[in-house]
Amino acid sequence: MSQLNSVWVFSDNPERYAELFGGAQQWGQQVYAIVQNTDQAQAVMPYGPKCLYVLAQNDALQRTENYAESIAALLKDKHPAMLLLAATKRGKALAARLSVQLNAALVNDATAVDIVDGHICAEHRMYGGLAFAQEKINSPLAIITLAPGVQEPCTSDTSHQCPTETVPYVAPRHEILCRERRAKAASSVDLSKAKRVVGVGRGLAAQDDLKMVHELAAVLNAEVGCSRPIAEGENWMERERYIGVSGVLLKSDLYLTLGISGQIQHMVGGNGAKVIVAINKDKNAPIFNYADYGLVGDIYKVVPALISQLSR
């Protein structure tokens, strides 16, 4: 695989920079990073950028999308071949604005990127995860938002130093204003980084029964995830634990599913696990088509037995 001269990265979520650098270092000879403040600059420095660009006029109420004009002005001057962003809600909103202002091709939620004969090729899901599309980008600049868990994080070198420059703030014609912030209870779990995950679906009859699921997860030293109906229909678990096409994409060593039917929208998120073990009382459940190991049984009988055996 050939490499581009330079790849630029930006993320509104600082935790995603390691993954972005992991991809950028693979696809580009040199990596440049855009960050929102000096604290992020210090955190990103060990990943090995050629230069760091710090966005000016940042404060707690500033919205990421308002930096589109500032970043666009910078990129017009530097002429990179690729801008890589984290595929967050705000990252994709910013990417859309930059695509218009720079007349650049945009691929959202990319699951793979390759450089073939100097051309950038990106893969992404379509039709709700039922298929993958391969896009060959012909514009001088490619803007790509990278799905979480796709790229291995890069290693860090705390001794690395590079120049830091400030990017002047160019106010957009219409700013998005944040008038107030309210605290939101959220899970600190990041399933995309978990080594073992226990997933629960509609086979669970009541919210109180999550207790046995967490007990099993504790024995396995695993995190707990769920299908979309559990998170957004029943509201039994946090949105951060939803596994699926518009949720978390797993890259775990083990994914143990309990009462999950295995619809394609869910398996888009679960299929990245190295080993899938399925427990479902319906022998015709689609999940068994994906599972490396399957057990036809009632989770209310199987899970307590597993906890008992694994606790010995």
Curated annotation (Swiss-Prot):
Residue stretches spanning the membrane: none
Family matches, as InterPro entries: DHS-like_NAD/FAD-binding_dom, ETF_a/b_N, ETF_a/FixB, ETF_asu_C, ETF_asu_C_CS, Rossmann-like_a/b/a_fold
Residues noted as binding FAD in the record, renumbered to the chain: 254-282
Any one GO BP annotation for this protein: fatty acid beta-oxidation using acyl-CoA dehydrogenase
Top-level taxon in the UniProt lineage: Bacteria
Keyword Lyase applies: no
SMART domains, A to Z: ETF
Gene3D superfamilies, sorted: HUPs, TPP-binding domain
Pfam families: ETF (PF01012), ETF_alpha (PF00766)
GO MF term set: electron transfer activity; flavin adenine dinucleotide binding
Entry-linked SUPFAM superfamilies: Adenine nucleotide alpha hydrolases-like, DHS-like NAD/FAD-binding domain
Entry keywords, A to Z: Electron transport, FAD, Flavoprotein, Transport
Family according to the record: Belongs to the ETF alpha-subunit/FixB family.
Summary of subunit composition and partner proteins: YdiR and YdiQ form a heterodimer.
Function: May play a role in a redox process.
Identification of the protein by name: Putative electron transfer flavoprotein subunit YdiR
Species: Escherichia coli (strain K12)
